[in-house]
Amino acid sequence: MKFVPSQEEVIAIANTGKYRVLPVSCEILSDFITPIETIKILKNVSTHCYMLESVAENEKWGRYTFLGFDPKLEITCINGEMKVGNIKFRTQNPSENIRQILSEYKSPRFDYLPSFTGGLVGYFSYDYLSYSEPTVRRDTVDNEEFKDVDLMLFDKVIAFDNYSQKIILMVNMQLDEPETGYNKAVMELKNLARLIRTGEKKDEDFGYITGEISQLFDKDGYCSMVEKAKRHIHEGDI
């Protein structure tokens, strides 16, 4: 496997002092496995995995399928209580805290890599808007207990290139010790390729219905709610 950039190029970039991390990558053919099969392997070694499809304008199928596992950091916030890793604190502006975290992982762009080479993956709930727009805070009971924001920081990325039928493996290395970091990244890339080739797939546990299915409202009630929502949208309330 060829690893890019080279160690000499990494050291030169590190000496500029512009970046703190850098993606080292290699490629393997994808003719022996699919993204779905790969995510089953990842689920067998980590409880935190993701799969994202890229999409571009006027494309029916995106070029890349991104997969990741074993996040480096978890970030959550609910009702102003933020948790970054094992550290908890109160905040009125989680966006500011998230931007600060991202600033510590600034990395260079390479033309031969897809636009996503690692970073935060997760969701922002509807209630997240209330931090910048307090008027949207709902006064109903939150039975679902969804977090306002739930993100994970991934420094290893598996990207299926659906156009060229190859898999791009990426590991983000720290640039404070470029030689040591590069050797570690290369070792992780080799381990990642080995995992994809030989890893065991996790058996899926399918759910099943344990009780009767009941509807919350009838068709007329549903249509009435839709019409009411449409009026609110037309009037600018939503």
Predicted feature locations:
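Extended accessory regions or peripheral subdomains of proteins
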Residues: M1-C49, S54-T91, Y126, S130-I238
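FAD-binding glycine-rich core of flavoenzymes that anchor FAD
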Residues: S95-L113
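Short hydrophobic "helix-edge" motifs at membrane interfaces and signal-peptide entry regions
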Residues: Y112-S115, V226-E227
